Amino acid sequence: MNYNNPPINFGINLGIELGQQTILSLYHSLFQSLINPIQKGDTVGLLALACKVDFEMLKPAIKLMENAWGLKVVLGESLTSEYHQFAGTDTVRANDFQMMLDNPEIKAIFSARGGYGSSRLLDSIDFTTFQKQLKWVIGFSDITAVHCHIHTLNIESLHATMPKLFLQEDGEASLESLRKVLFGEETNYKIEPHQMNRLGAANGQLIGGNLAILVHVIGSKSDINYDGKILFLEDVNEYLYNIDRMMIQLKRSGKLQNLVGLIVGSFSDCQDNDVPFGKTANEIIQEAVAEYDFPVCYGFPVGHEINNWAIPCGREMSLLVEEYGVSLKGNYLYI
């Protein structure tokens, strides 16, 4: 049975008369794999899945994880490797990732930074052991490719700030949101209303991340089913016309039509041509989803900004968009 595409009569088989959205939500919650919280004294892994990183810049983050969070940190070879713009060859980075996925002592895996290169590794990784011993895989931006692939396995992953950014100025809220999810503390988000919001309520698994990467994996082994899900989007340094092109790609490929909710994060440092495109990123997205009726939240603190709150991809969440604000709440029952 394909758990990512449940039969429409699933609720009927349970003898429950529910709306289709609630049926999908219930179905996914029954079969999703929740990851147990980490604890002080646990071991975590730190590697670089994509671009090379200055190891000296990571030392404060490593110290924080060891001293403030009480964790033991295993360091990957990729942290000190370099191959052109990458953190070592594909083989070096893949070996790090495979080792940390397979090591039962490692309870979470942090990618030090994004950039480009994660998707180059995915077809060489064996996720069999990972499916039996679940652990958090953490990162954002280019790491969206990894989140998508993990979602095809019906396992959670964590879209969140990365060690390279742990101690950036005014980044305490992002770091604390990551710590709370990792250690299993209740994390319910509330934000102020946005004038472009479309009101409504939704329940479903959260999916998403970087728009360019989501479009990049369409048609690949890492492509995911969007039906019945709450999608969140963010991006950085993209031309406005390209944001429009990517949203059209999501729409034409059928990714938007069966969503139950949409969360629009930051679209930072957007570029434009000499002849302006004529719309902002938010306006482009608004136009792309205008024909649908699911709730839409704009201005959520996720993306390439100081405020980049941790979002558990694949977790069953409730989104409520009201006139006076927005709330996002999750299911925190662990197996």
Sequence positions of predicted segments:
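Conserved beta-alpha junction segments in alpha/beta enzyme cores
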Residues: 53, 57, 205-236
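Short, acidic/small-residue loops that bind anionic groups at enzyme active sites
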Residues: 127-149, 156-162
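ATP/NTP phosphate-donor binding region
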Residues: 27-105
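Internal helical hairpin/lid segments
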Residues: 225-281
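Conserved anion/nucleotide-ligand pocket segment
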Residues: 156-213
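N-terminal glycine-rich "phosphate-gripper" loop used for MgATP/nucleotide binding
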Residues: 108-119
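ATP/nucleoside-binding phosphotransfer catalytic cores, i.e., glycine-rich phosphate-binding loops
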Residues: 269-335
